[in-house]
Design a protein with these regions (language model features):
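Active-site metal-binding motif and surrounding structural segment of the metallo-beta-lactamase
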Residues: 41-87, 91
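Metallo-beta-lactamase
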Residues: 92-147
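Pre-active-site segment of Zn-dependent metallo-hydrolases
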Residues: 31-61, 105-106, 127, 133
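Hydrophobic/aromatic beta-strand patches that form the interior of the parallel beta-sheet core
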Residues: 12, 62, 86, 135-137
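Conserved beta-strand hairpin/beta-sheet module of binuclear metal-dependent hydrolase folds
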Residues: 2-51
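Short loop segments at secondary-structure junctions
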Residues: 27-29, 83, 140
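A generic local structural motif
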Residues: 17-19, 46-50, 71-72, 123, ...
Length: 147
């Protein structure tokens, strides 16, 4: 069963369980959008291979935000591919410290989120491996990865 679903000619959804990542094929190589939970790099790379592409061609990693379910495997993806990383300025503190969430975040939405919280978030905070962001992103400009 493939863990890559082709959305358009050059865009794939990479299925990783509770969260997904996306893969964009550009003239400059592959752009991975998000890196899932910690220890999911092999799952990501397997899904990239399911798309018919090579994980070694990942040149850019764009994080939608710095929470553990989107940035957890980022450090390992970057280390194994040599890709450049991109994140919004507002997430730099989380990413630089490898923190799962802003310390002020609390779960109050019912039993299912509480169960997820208890299973995946350690009391006092869950961490992932911190890494350096190569370039910050702003929603006020556009970006091209094919130059």
């Amino acid at each position: 069963m493939s863990n890559a679903f082709q959305i358009s000619r050059n865009l794939w959804e990479l299925k990783m369980g509770m969260v997904n990542a996306y893969l964009l094929e550009t003239m400059d190589g592959l752009v991975l959008i998000d890196a899932g939970w910690p220890n999911k790099t092999d799952t990501i790379f397997s899904a990239v291979q399911d798309s018919g592409l090579d994980p070694k061609d990942i040149r850019h990693l764009v994080l939608t935000h710095g929470h553990i379910d989107h940035a957890g495997s980022a450090a390992e993806v970057l280390q194994r591919t040599g890709a450049r990383s991109y994140a919004h300025t507002a997430d730099l503190d989380l990413i630089n410290e490898g923190k799962a969430e802003d310390p002020g975040t609390s779960v109050t939405l019912g039993i299912i989120p509480k169960i997820v919280y208890l299973l995946f978030i350690k009391p006092g905070g869950t961490t992932y491996k911190a890494f350096a962001v190569d370039q910050t992103l702003s929603l006020e400009r556009s970006y091209r990865f094919d130059q």
